[in-house]
Amino acid sequence: MRFVMSLGVVALGAGCAHAPKPADPAARAQQLSAEAEQAYKALDFERCAERFQAAGEADAEGPDRAESLYRAAGCASLAGHADAAVDVLKRAVQGGYYDADHLEYNPELAALHALPAWSGIVAEARANLMKAPEPPFPVPTLKGVDAFGSRRVDQETVRQVLGLEVGKPIVHSGAIFRQKERLLRNQYNLVFARMGMTLFFASELKGSAFVVMDMVDAEDAAVRAYFLAPPKGHATDPEGLIARWNAYEDRMTQLQMQGKLAEDSSCRIAHCIGGFGHPDLAAFEPEFLAKVPKHVDALTTVLREDADAEKRAAAAFLLAYAPTAQETVECLRPFIRDPEDGVRNSVLRVLTATQEAAKQPLLHVSVVADAVLLPTSMDRNKATYLLTYLLDDLPPEALKAQRAELIQKLGQTLVEMSALTLPINRDPAVMVLKQLSGEQYETADEWRAWLARQPKTAG
């Protein structure tokens, strides 16, 4: 830190007429925050703490400064510097940080709980909360922990490794989750381990969180964990559509987290992630409707060639506005196995909504069945819903002809999914099992017994 600060003093104190102007403080803070995020993702907590603290010091007084200092405290704690973490955390709350529940339940700060200053820090954050302009996003309650995909790691093992307790508040920590994933991969010979957390913003599950540890045993990699090669190019953004979609999604997410997005807000196409009913969002959809049909090829190029996964995901969402449903499907189908989770999620979301709205099959059953075996819960839940809609649209004789092969290929996976606690993973699996079996069972034990009675080979 001293070395960096000294360089800054020299540069500013030279007084030369040709010296560069000091960087804009807001831009400098943003750059430092981006560097801190990179360090955080790399589990480089020393650099993460230093960069977030520098971002806070570069920023003006206000919530962004307090948030940067709060993040610096988490990284310092993870780096093993408890005293330094306390010092910077005090500065965060003195600067107005007010998300007291997040602070209290943040696992990155667990090492500070036994220190004398902890209770005072929490109390000051709660005092700040009383003066906050609006309440923070509430900390959810953990409702379930699932383990999926490994023959060697069960639900209780995952719960113990993660140190989670159902019924307690949970704060997401990407760094701690990655550490636990690495531990499981090394200890149980997994080629893939990914922890995901699903939050519910509405319905009877509002305020609930579910954690899923998705895994692939090393011997299953060829079937379940192969993807397209990562793109390396930089495709043109046609008429700024990618940027506009990202602007829409950013604002829509803000409104959703603030509880300001109407649940019945709709779209004029099959796929809809938040609608356009709010005044802040109303201008976006007419633009997408007018421009996307002219740029289907260019958006498909982004999806195929651009190295930026965020741009590829946006292109997938925009292709829902292609002139016909079949064009949407044909553009997206080749990218079901994109190497990035978020892109696959976007592709499968649009395919699922498009098939749901259709009256005839738009994809081959084998393509969708392969997608059900993908490694993450985001992959599987959408692929399995997609399969339910596809089977609904198959003629009865076609469904009957494929029944045995589908049971052979997917039966075990679907039965395992029927035992999960996360409803959006369990429910579509039960739906497909009912379609394939003609039975109306509900529990995983009933489906296990049913599967045991089926022939062991197709045909």
Question: Residue ranges of each PLM-predicted region?
Answer:
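Extended repeat-based scaffolds of very large eukaryotic assembly and lipid-transport proteins
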Residues: R126, V216-Q326, R337, D341-N345, ...
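Start-of-helix register in tetratricopeptide repeats
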Residues: Q30, D64-E67
